């Protein structure tokens, strides 16, 4: 340095010793410089950590939680910002993390599969910056997962009594391009978008469509209560095996616990071998009066409402 110099410029931190010589006298002075910061902070984004929620489909997440690390060896970290985007391009819009944050979380709102990246930007106290971003993750909202399953309907329950089995028809909607299976009332499965099942007894019939991608499911149930395969119950009373000078009154009592008793027909016949197909009389009450002389058998035919 010249004898008239009053300052010196240094570019690095460290100890600097100055010697002043005047004749035979030498004076030394050491100065420490420690506030020079020319380096950017460091930052990195780790892999998925606790709190991450994976959908039933492997590699697709409804929530992701990523660990972050950052440091600055000199002036120190002042601010950490983050941004979730769909690409590796450095974002223009950022949010500020709370001081000391070690993780960043994202809960998906997307209705379709979407690629997400976490970007972080670290500032030191001299406004040097460092950016880093995560690997790509595929996300979809929990609502979309639940709603991804096709919808299903079932119809065809009889509205009037019948003595035949009922044909029930089920149909899917919103199924195009989806991976699903339909679980039928008997436990069998189908991958068709529609089909039929047969109801052979009264009861509830449920069909379920299960989404094989995300595990959601929808069901439809129909109540069948108009099947009647059982004949009415009939009891006959009255009449006598002995000769009588009076009219004979026969009482026919019918009941049916399902569709109910329908039409009742009868005919007085002279022997039990005759099964009449014509000439039957409709019975409007419960009693039949036989007035003619002779020996008769009452042939009756009772219907239910099925």
Placement of each model-derived feature along the sequence:
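Low-complexity, disordered linker/stalk regions enriched in Pro/Thr/Ser/Gly
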Residues: 1-306
